[in-house]
């Protein structure tokens, strides 16, 4: 009986096909999209999950306190679901669904028995009027847009207590004033260097609790390989 239940949990997402993320955090052994996704998730998830857990813990004075969370540019809503599992009372994922990953988010959340997660298909722009929540995660969105500073300002304004940021940076350039839009080889997006992204972020977000850098080993080009992480307190 135990083995049957365990097998059912491992295969609960099987019919959805390969997914953007591996859901092993939830005890599910699903198939993942081929290519860069596995290696890049291994780089990003430990850092971002740790930041989410820290922000939730520091947002509570009593165990009964409610904590709210929003993931901007959420794709399949993975981190909104992680925040729910780690104790957020309400968790929201927002994405324009350009890459057609959001369509699976509600189904995945339901199968994982996460009943306090909601998803919104909307464009994220400087003029957006989203509700503020205790924790905002902008992880993987800033390098996709034409106006990263304005989107970072929006993200910071939305956060009542903590902002979590992750973005791709170029390892091909190292000068502190480097900025290119569109991103090299792309028709959209942008690129900073490590130094220039750090300089830009510190202008908007003064209270950095922790920062981290690693490489996205699933990306071959130096222009796409750097990954910066920040945990910011309001």
Name each model feature, range by range:
Residues 144-155:
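A short, conserved alpha-helix within the catalytic core of class I
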Residues 135-146:
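A short SAM/SAH-binding and catalytic strip from SAM-dependent methyltransferases
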Residues 78, 82-114:
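Class I SAM-dependent methyltransferase SAM/SAH-binding core
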Residues 65-75:
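Conserved class I S-adenosyl-L-methionine
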Residues 180-196:
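Acceptor-substrate binding/catalytic loop of class I
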Residues 161-170:
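Conserved beta-strand signature within the Rossmann-like core of class I S-adenosyl-L-methionine
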Residues 39-65:
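Conserved alpha-helix/loop element of class I SAM-dependent methyltransferases that forms part
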């Amino acid at each position: 009986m135990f083995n049957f239940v365990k097998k059912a949990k491992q295969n609960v997402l099987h019919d959805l096909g390969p997914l953007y993320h591996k859901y092993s955090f939830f005890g599910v052994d699903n198939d993942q999209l081929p290519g860069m996704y596995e290696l890049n998730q291994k780089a990003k998830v430990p850092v971002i999950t740790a930041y989410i857990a820290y922000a939730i813990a520091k947002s509570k004075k009593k165990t009964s306190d409610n904590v709210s969370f929003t993931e901007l540019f959420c794709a399949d809503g993975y981190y909104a679901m992680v925040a729910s599992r780690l104790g957020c009372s309400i968790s929201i994922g927002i994405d324009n669904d350009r890459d057609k990953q959001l369509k699976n988010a509600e189904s995945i959340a339901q199968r994982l028995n996460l009943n306090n997660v909601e998803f919104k298909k909307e464009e994220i722009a400087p003029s957006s009027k989203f509700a503020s929540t205790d924790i905002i995660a902008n992880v993987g969105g800033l390098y996709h847009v034409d106006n990263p500073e304005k989107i970072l300002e929006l993200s910071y304004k939305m956060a009542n207590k903590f902002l979590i940021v992750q973005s791709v940076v170029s390892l091909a350039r190292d000068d502190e004033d480097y900025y290119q839009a569109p991103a090299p080889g792309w028709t959209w997006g942008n690129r900073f260097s490590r130094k220039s992204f750090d300089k830009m972020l510190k202008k908007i977000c003064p209270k950095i609790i922790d920062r981290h850098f690693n490489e996205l080993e699933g990306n071959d080009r130096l222009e796409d390989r750097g990954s910066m992480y920040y945990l910011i307190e309001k």
